[in-house]
């Protein structure tokens, strides 16, 4: 169910902006110099609900100063991972299509770029590509490259970049009618591919609890689960079948208690609901504000109140 990537190269890396490594590949964060990635082209390749670009500064300010292994069980668009670019990482997402995209970027980026260049920005073509997953047998026969290309294309051309599937797991976001969507973005794809292949990054597709069992003592875990809804209509878990309700939130809290008992530091983001604040009452809970750009309702995009929860000091 998972794929392991190559070993990281052992070498000393000089300080680069707010990030540097020592000769043991321990990521050292100098929070006083702000956030600066080693390669600015290593950025998210897909737009994802709950993406953390708008919250990066708040997250980075609260990271522990030394990180030997970075773990992210709810990867999504990977904004935090790609900003930090750790040498040793364990990353995971329950969305199989999303993890396939990362595997193909790592293993076959040039063939992926060639496939993306063939796509058309028309409504008729969009729906023909979108509906490929209606025939389950035919969809399974598609190559990994074509399936990854399809997901990126749909993400770049669907309405507001909202990756959404129905109860049958079929992509159902409508066409976005964008004039010039950046479907290919080859420079970013190549940069992300280089990052994934040059470092010890492990890609997983499994339940978050299974991944967290593999995290070694002394590691750092960033948790960005589907958020607890602030109202009865606010929940969005359409990027995966099944959803993520209160029972899942409680199961995640139990995992966080287990991490703490094992000496693993974690930082968790979620919505600022009374349920979440009470659930994590024994931890450091801080309120922050983030701007949300992906929402099917345009009136609900904008600044929202969230919480960052951690089990370690500043």
Regions found by a protein language model. Give the residues of each.
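SAM-dependent nucleic-acid methyltransferase catalytic core
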Residues: 13-18, 22-54, 61, 65, ...
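Short, polar loop motifs at secondary-structure junctions
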Residues: 74-79, 189, 270-274
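Short, glycine/acidic-enriched loop or turn micro-motifs at the edges of active sites
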Residues: 75, 96, 210, 227, ...
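Conserved acidic-Pro-Pro-aromatic motif
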Residues: 218-304, 308
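Short loop/helix-cap segments at secondary-structure boundaries that form the rim of catalytic
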Residues: 81-85, 213-215, 276-282
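SAM cofactor-binding core of SAM-dependent methyltransferases
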Residues: 68-133
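Short, low-complexity intrinsically disordered segments enriched in A/P/G/S/L with frequent Arg
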Residues: 6-9, 19
């Amino acid at each position: 169910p998972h794929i392991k990537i190559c070993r990281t190269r052992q070498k000393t890396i000089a300080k680069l902006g707010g990030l540097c490594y020592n000769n043991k590949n321990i990521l050292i964060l100098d929070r006083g110099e702000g956030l600066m990635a080693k390669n600015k082209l290593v950025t998210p390749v897909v737009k994802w609900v709950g993406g953390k670009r708008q919250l990066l500064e708040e997250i980075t300010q609260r990271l522990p100063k030394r990180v030997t292994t970075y773990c992210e069980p709810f990867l999504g668009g990977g904004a935090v991972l790609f900003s930090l670019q750790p040498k040793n990482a364990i990353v995971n997402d329950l969305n199989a299509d999303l993890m396939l995209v990362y595997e193909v970027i790592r293993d076959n980026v040039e063939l992926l770029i060639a496939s993306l260049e063939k796509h058309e920005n028309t409504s008729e073509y969009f729906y023909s590509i979108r509906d490929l997953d209606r025939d389950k047998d035919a969809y399974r026969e598609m190559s990994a490259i074509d399936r990854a290309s399809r997901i990126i294309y749909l993400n770049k051309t669907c309405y507001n970049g909202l990756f959404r599937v129905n109860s049958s797991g079929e992509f159902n976001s409508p066409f976005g009618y964008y004039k010039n969507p950046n479907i290919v973005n080859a420079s970013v794809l190549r940069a992300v591919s280089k990052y994934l292949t040059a470092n010890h990054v492990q890609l997983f597709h499994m339940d978050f609890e299974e991944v967290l069992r593999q995290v070694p003592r002394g590691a750092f875990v960033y948790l960005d689960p589907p958020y607890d809804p602030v109202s009865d209509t606010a929940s969005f878990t359409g990027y995966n079948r099944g959803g993520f309700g209160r029972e899942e939130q409680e199961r995640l809290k139990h995992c966080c208690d287990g991490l703490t008992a094992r000496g693993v530091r974690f930082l968790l983001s979620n919505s600022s609901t009374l349920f979440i604040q009470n659930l994590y009452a024994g931890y450091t809970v801080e309120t922050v504000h983030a701007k949300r750009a992906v929402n099917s309702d345009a009136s609900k995009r904008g600044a929202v109140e969230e919480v960052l929860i951690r089990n370690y000091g500043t």
